[in-house]
From Swiss-Prot:
It catalyses: dihydroxyacetone phosphate = methylglyoxal + phosphate. SMART domains: MGS (SM00851). This is Methylglyoxal synthase. Residues 1-126 form the MGS-like domain. Keywords: Lyase. The keyword Lipoprotein does not apply. Substrate binds at H12, K16, T38, G39, T40, T41, S59, G60, H92. Belongs to the methylglyoxal synthase family. The gene is mgsA. One of its GO terms (biological process) is methylglyoxal biosynthetic process. The keyword Lyase applies. The active site is at D65. GO terms for molecular function: methylglyoxal synthase activity.
Amino acid sequence: MAERQKIALIAHDKMKDEMAAFARHHQRFLEQWQIVATGTTGARVHDACPKLDVLRMKSGPLGGDQQIGAMIAQEEVAMLIFFVDPLTPMPHDVDVKALMRLAILYDTPMALNRATADRLLPVITE
């Protein structure tokens, strides 16, 4: 098993401000990790926290969710934080389901909202 040194950050369009705020709030902790993120989410997180090591994948609908899913399957990701907008239908919903399935299959902690992410992040190193 590979050492899980990455935290994955993904946010639906209406949740990107919340993800940037989350990253700012937890910046000191996140600086210890390589952050992998889908394209626009990664740009927003990097703009909010320039000191973070953010590796940007493609946009979610263009395959970014699947790129992060591959990292989960390689057991490189310690935690998936995915701020989901439950009120907006997503055209690439099947990609999102596949990503979540991989996180479940590989027993990767997954937070789908801010409250869960705030509580899980501090214990990820235990």
